[in-house]
Curated annotation (Swiss-Prot):
Residues 2-129, 141-273 form the EamA domain. This is Riboflavin transporter. It comes from Brucella anthropi (strain ATCC 49188 / DSM 6882 / CCUG 24695 / JCM 21032 / LMG 3331 / NBRC 15819 / NCTC 12168 / Alc 37) (Ochrobactrum anthropi). Its main location: membrane. It is a multi-pass membrane protein. Induction: Negatively regulated by riboflavin, probably via an FMN riboswitch.
Length: 284
């Protein structure tokens, strides 16, 4: 999991570099990121054959992946306008959105402890955004929007597990994400020719982003295959300090003073939530 967090941090740094230093539009970054990742993971799909694509809920798969694609687009756009440390910290509000979505759409029970945890997490996000400060911009809300979209994706994934096999759910994620990102790119009207950076620099950074995306997903899947999610959660939270370190090394960008108390509230609420869920599972 630590390797996965490090790989994702490399993706975030490379994505911010591509958007701010190379001038590649976010829709183009998103498209090539997952095309390259798909190519690198294609051998795994070929191994399972067309069996993984058999489904009677194709429409739900499309809706689920569309939410994921929208989250990716918003995430990458945020990385071109907001410091890495802020983007990553605010994205960690996703579990709290999952609680709200699960209550609204899956009718799952929400305990007072979960409500308090959710409220605490959002207070942490508010402290990081600091809408009362002069440095606040509307771009600061983008990571929260991405977190909400990914929460919708997670809830739909959980719903699909009632009918679909994990292999089918994973396969459709990879297969559908590329055409959806392609459609968003075409709708934007942008082209590769609009990028003024040298081709070598453009393709080098895009390949790095795609390769580390595939690597991060592999490490993450491997981690969840050998350990429980509750055990891995503290290691997953390491992505925040790892991203802060990477961002500081590459961009010399240090977090603001608001970051630390806000991040502490978000991580603390997340860990408490995981501990509560672990206790509930053992009781059941």
């Amino acid at each position: 999991m630590v390797a996965a967090c490090s790989a994702y941090a490399a993706v975030n740094v490379a994505t911010q570099w591509a958007g701010t230093r190379t001038g590649i539009p976010s829709v183009i970054i998103a498209f090539w990121q997952y095309v390259i990742a798909l190519v690198l993971t294609l051998p795994l799909l070929v191994r399972d054959g067309t069996r993984a694509l058999r489904t009677s809920h194709f429409g739900l798969h499309v809706m689920r992946v569309a939410l994921a694609a929208a989250g990716v687009q918003v995430w990458i756009y945020a990385l071109t306008h907001v410091p890495i440390w802020q983007v990553v910290a605010l994205s960690m509000t996703s579990p709290f959105f999952v609680i709200l979505c699960a209550r609204l759409f899956l009718q799952e029970k929400v305990t007072p402890a979960r409500l308090l945890t959710t409220f605490t997490g959002f207070i942490g996000a508010l402290i990081i955004i600091a809408p009362w400060s002069d440095s606040y911009t509307v771009y600061s809300l983008l990571p929260i929007l991405a977190a909400a979209l990914w929460a919708g994706y997670s809830v739909m994934t959980k719903y699909l597990t009632r009918f679909e096999k994990p292999a089918s759910i994973s396969a459709y994620m990879l297969v559908l994400l590329t055409p959806i990102n392609a459609a968003l790119w075409l709708a934007s009207g942008l082209s590769m020719s609009a990028i003024t950076a040298p081709d070598v620099e453009i393709w080098s950074i895009l390949i790095v982003i795609g390769a580390f995306t595939a690597l991060a997903q592999y490490f993450q899947t491997a981690a969840y295959s050998i350990a429980d999610a509750v055990y891995l959660q503290p290691f997953d939270d390491l992505r925040l300090p790892i991203n802060v370190i990477f961002g500081w090394i590459v961009f010399a960008a240090a977090p603001s003073i608001n970051f630390w108390p806000g991040a502490a509230l978000i991580i603390g609420a997340s860990l408490y939530l995981m501990r509560q869920d672990s206790g509930t599972s053992r009781t059941a």
